[in-house]
A protein has these predicted regions:
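Phosphate-binding loop of NTP-binding sites
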Residues: 65-213, 217-228, 259
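Short strand-coil-strand connectors
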Residues: 6, 20, 120, 258-262
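Short strand->helix junction
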Residues: 22-23, 182-183, 273
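N-terminal leader/targeting and accessory segments in enzymes
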Residues: 1-67, 71, 216, 242-244
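Short, acidic/turn-prone active-site loops that include or flank metal/cofactor-
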Residues: 60-63, 178-182, 233-237
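Structural signal for conserved beta-strand scaffold positions within catalytic alpha/beta enzyme cores
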Residues: 18, 43, 57-58, 84, ...
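A short, glycine/Asx- and small/polar-enriched loop/turn
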Residues: 10-13, 168-169, 239, 249-251
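Adenine nucleotide phosphate-binding catalytic loops in nucleotide-utilizing enzymes
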Residues: 53, 187-194, 198, 223, ...
Length: 275
C-alpha cells in the first residue's frame, strides 16, 4: 500500500491526500482517486459535499504532510546520512559531486535534484521539480533504505523550503553555496529569498554546516547553527577550508585544499574556479 498526492498514481488500497496546491486543487480529483480504488482520502476541508465514508476532512492538513510521510515510510531520512544543498547556483553540481565522490570511496550514495533521483552517474530519471514533494521524497528515501543506500545528497531549493517539501527530514549536513538575485518574482525581495534558504539551517539544525565564506549572504547559516560549521574560501587563507588554485589549463584545474583534515593537492578535469 502507498500514499500519494497524485490521483493518477492511486491503486487499489492506496491513500490519496487532497490539498490545495500552488497551481492545482487536489480536492478536484477526489472522485478520480475513489474510482481508482483509494482506501482512504485525507482532504483539506471543503464545501459540504458528501463523498462517502472513505473521505476524511483534516484541518490544516498541509502542515502535517511532513510528519505523515515520515511516519508512513518509517522515518527513512533518520536511517541515512542526508546532505542537503541550498543556494542560488551550484546545487546540482555540488550534489552530483558529493554522490560521485562517495561512490568512488565505495559507498552507496543517491542524489536527488534537477537531474532526478539517481544512484549512478549518467542515470536518466524524469524530474518535475528540483526538490520532489514531501510524500514522493520520503517514498524515494524509503526505497533506497531498503536497497542498502547509506548516503543521499539532496538539492534543497528555496521553493521547496518555503513550501514545506522537506518537513520532517533529518538533515545530517547542510550546505549553502551562494546567494544572488533570483526567484524574486516568487519571494518578493532578497531578504525573503535569503530567509527561505536559511530555513535549512534554522528549522532543520543539521549536525554539520558548510557555507561559502566568500559570500556574506551565506554566513547566516553559520550563525543559525549551534553545531560545527565550516566556511570554504578561495581568497582567505585563514578560513576553515581554504582552496588555492595552482593552475588553470584547457584540461582542467590543479588546486590545493587546506582543511582541518590536512592538506591535499588535486588535479581535476573541472573547468572554472566556480567549481
Amino acid at each position: 500500500y502507498d500514499i500519494t498526492l497524485d490521483s493518477r498514481q492511486v491503486t487499489t488500497g492506496a491513500g490519496f491526500i487532497a490539498i490545495q496546491g500552488a497551481q492545482t486543487d487536489g480536492r478536484r480529483f477526489i472522485p478520480d482517486a475513489l474510482e481508482r480504488g483509494a482506501a482512504v482520502v485525507l482532504a483539506e476541508p471543503f464545501e459540504a459535499v458528501d463523498l462517502g465514508p472513505r473521505v476524511v476532512k483534516v484541518p490544516d492538513l498541509k502542515s502535517h504532510l511532513g510528519e505523515l510521510a515520515k511516519r508512513f515510510y518509517a522515518d527513512p531520512s533518520a536511517q541515512l546520512a542526508l546532505l542537503a544543498v541550498t543556494g542560488t547556483n551550484g546545487k546540482t553540481s555540488i550534489s552530483d559531486y558529493i554522490g560521485q565522490l562517495l561512490r568512488l570511496l565505495g559507498e552507496s550514495a543517491g542524489t536527488i535534484g534537477t537531474l532526478g533521483a539517481r544512484l549512478r552517474s549518467g542515470e536518466a530519471v524524469e524530474s518535475q521539480n528540483t526538490t520532489p514533494d514531501v510524500i514522493s521524497l520520503n517514498r524515494q528515501l524509503a526505497d533506497w533504505v531498503d536497497q542498502g543506500v547509506r548516503f543521499v545528497a539532496l538539492e534543497a531549493s528555496s521553493h521547496a523550503l518555503e513550501q514545506s517539501r522537506l518537513d520532517g527530514l533529518t538533515v545530517h549536513t547542510g550546505v549553502f553555496s551562494n546567494l544572488t538575485r533570483d526567484h524574486l518574482d516568487y519571494h518578493g525581495n532578497l531578504d525573503s529569498y535569503r530567509n527561505a534558504k536559511l530555513r535549512l539551517f534554522n528549522d532543520f539544525t543539521p549536525d554539520r554546516v558548510i557555507y561559502n565564506a566568500d559570500d556574506p549572504s551565506t554566513r547566516g547559516a553559520r550563525e543559525a547553527s549551534a553545531n560545527p560549521a565550516l566556511g570554504v574560501s578561495l581568497v582567505n587563507a585563514s578560513a576553515d577550508v581554504y582552496v588555492k588554485v595552482l593552475d588553470e589549463t584547457p584540461t582542467g584545474l590543479r588546486f590545493q585544499i587546506h582543511s582541518p583534515c590536512g592538506t591535499a593537492e588535486i588535479d581535476s578535469a573541472l573547468h572554472g574556479r566556480c567549481h
